[in-house]
Amino acid sequence: FYSAHLFLKDINWLKSLAIGDYKMSFGQGLVISNDFSPSRTAVVAQAERRTNGFRRHFSTNEQDFFRGVAGTITIKNLDISVFYSYRKMDAAVDSLTFTSLKTDGLHRLQRDWEKRKTITMQVYGGNIRYAKPHFHVGLTALSYSFGKFKMDPDPKPYNLFYFKGSNNFNMGVDYMLKTNRIKSVSYTHLTLPTNSR
């Protein structure tokens, strides 16, 4: 496993630029997020997730990152972000169909090596965020494709609504409004499988 990146930050109107391997998170993380977040918390104030934008990837994790180019420019209170990623992923492919991605990064056995870098994944999209001290609103859109390969999970009760197909589009809107006594955080998410089966 190898990883490399060039990351520039806070240069005039350029808030960030990532070339190579990077991570990202926008909104409340339903559309896209590589950040670690606990699944539950007893503290209500911690339920809101922070938007970290793009960050460099320097972990030994072979799966949880993007490879390509991404950047954010800032115009007054407006952040405009775009990203593109293309990389090979591990999966057990049978006649251009796979049931799931292999995400453990282990290649100890022959069957592990047979799944290594067998499919391609292309991801592109963007985020627009307008922020003031007591208010922000953001729109995130993301499209990903497995090219000629199709995901077809084994039919089980727990994956009844999992994505099936080779192309998918996700979009989400998030906002935060804060007053002296009340803080309101909300998120709306939409998924449009473009060729699900």
Functional labels for PLM-detected ranges:
Residues 30-36, 92-100, 149-157:
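Outer-membrane beta-barrel translocator domains and adjoining extracellular loop/strand segments
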